UniProtKB/Swiss-Prot annotation:
One term under GO cellular component: plasma membrane
A single GO molecular function term of this UniProt record: melanocyte-stimulating hormone receptor activity
Extracellular side: 1-37, 94-118, 184-191, 267-279
Complex and partners: Interacts with MGRN1, but does not undergo MGRN1-mediated ubiquitination; this interaction competes with GNAS-binding and thus inhibits agonist-induced cAMP production. Interacts with OPN3; the interaction results in a decrease in MC1R-mediated cAMP signaling and ultimately a decrease in melanin production in melanocytes.
Membrane topology summary: Multi-pass membrane protein
Role: Receptor for MSH (alpha, beta and gamma) and ACTH. The activity of this receptor is mediated by G proteins which activate adenylate cyclase. Mediates melanogenesis, the production of eumelanin (black/brown) and phaeomelanin (red/yellow), via regulation of cAMP signaling in melanocytes.
Keywords attached to this entry: Cell membrane, G-protein coupled receptor, Glycoprotein, Lipoprotein, Membrane, Palmitate, Receptor, Transducer, Transmembrane, Transmembrane helix
Localization annotation: Cell membrane
GO terms classed as biological process: adenylate cyclase-activating G protein-coupled receptor signaling pathway; regulation of metabolic process
Family: Belongs to the G-protein coupled receptor 1 family.
Name recorded for this polypeptide: Melanocyte-stimulating hormone receptor
Protein species of origin: Canis lupus familiaris (Dog)
PROSITE patterns: G_PROTEIN_RECEP_F1_1, G_PROTEIN_RECEP_F1_2
């Protein structure tokens, strides 16, 4: 990965400089403090990646199979699944190639490995950018469906949805190519971090506004039924819990990776920041975990999609 600076995973494997058997340890810097390093076993990383691949393939297959799901909202969810699928596939592919090179089962020259690493990095970066974009697109779509309910179908049409989807994919490919080509430039890392913060703020503002509108609607219903306190309190707690889970998972899974990028700009040589850099594979694992969780948050809550998913699974057997 280019995000590790000179410690590229595939090239490190080729040169025999990859880390030893992963474990949970305290690593001591020569000039700094003892660092808590959480190394992820390759078997666990590959297993999580494969689980994510299966989940997101099923989501895409279910949406493709059921015509009732051929709407802008489900297309955005399907594209999020494709992005998460690419995140998992590219990381699993990189790890698998790394293990093959380490075991001597795959003989390759440094130049070939360099090109392969660049291609994989472009795919990983592009899939991450598109995943964040589609998370934002889903938030915007839900916002429009609540605040512009009567005009929603005239605002969010299929042609507009497809144009937005196409623009996201094109922008993701172009930006990832530029990011990988100029990853040594501070501006590139700052752009990536700023993009993450912008998506986080966008999602937080939209979902908080939606929660406020939903609570206002619940109060109106409660007044009509003369059960204002109990209904409003119960709905408020449920809505706040849902919002906390949604934004919390997003921040916990993506935040450490972008903290890593931020520290690469702010303190690349500081010993304490070096402790954070040592846990890069943990941050990638958290992103894979996000790819596993996303279908449960955005896709599997739909009864129609769950029914179609069951049909897809039964047909595959």
């Amino acid at each position: 990965m280019v995000w590790q600076g000179p410690q590229r995973r595939l090239l490190g494997s080729l040169n025999g400089t990859s880390p030893a058997t992963p474990h949970f340890e305290l690593a001591a810097n020569q000039t700094g403090p003892r660092c808590l390093e959480v190394s992820i076993p390759n078997g666990l990383f590959l297993s999580l990646g494969l689980v994510s691949v299966v989940e997101n393939v099923l989501v895409v297959a279910a949406i493709a199979k059921n015509r009732n799901l051929h709407s802008p909202m489900y297309y955005f969810i399907g594209c999020l699944a494709v992005s998460d699928l690419l995140v998992s596939v590219t990381n699993v592919l990189e790890t698998a190639v790394m293990l093959l090179v380490e075991a001597g089962a795959l003989a390759a020259q440094a130049a070939v490995v360099q090109q392969l690493d660049d291609i994989i990095d472009v795919l990983i970066c592009g899939s991450m950018v598109s995943s964040l974009c589609f998370l934002g697109a889903i938030a915007v779509d839900r916002y429009l469906s609540i605040f512009y309910a009567l005009r929603y179908h005239s605002i969010v049409t299929l042609p507009r949805a497809w144009r937005a989807i196409s623009a996201i994919w094109v922008a993701s490919v172009l930006s990832s190519t530029l990011f990988i080509a100029y990853y040594n430039h501070t501006a590139v890392l700052l752009c990536l971090v700023s993009f993450f913060v912008a998506m986080l703020v966008l999602m937080a503002v939209l979902y908080v506004h939606m929660l406020a509108r939903a609570r206002q609607h619940a109060r109106g219903i409660a007044r009509l039924r003369k059960r204002q306190h109990s209904v409003h309190q119960g709905f408020g707690l449920k809505g706040a819990a849902t919002l906390t889970i949604l934004l919390g998972i997003f921040f916990l899974c993506w935040g450490p990776f972008f903290l890593h990028l931020s520290l690469m700009v702010l303190c690349p040589q500081h010993p304490i920041c070096g402790c954070v850099f040592q846990n890069f594979n943990l941050f990638l694992t958290l992103i894979i975990c996000n790819s596993i969780i996303d279908p449960f948050i955005y896709a599997f809550r739909s009864q129609e999609l769950r029914k179609t998913l069951q049909e897809v699974v039964l047909c595959s057997w």
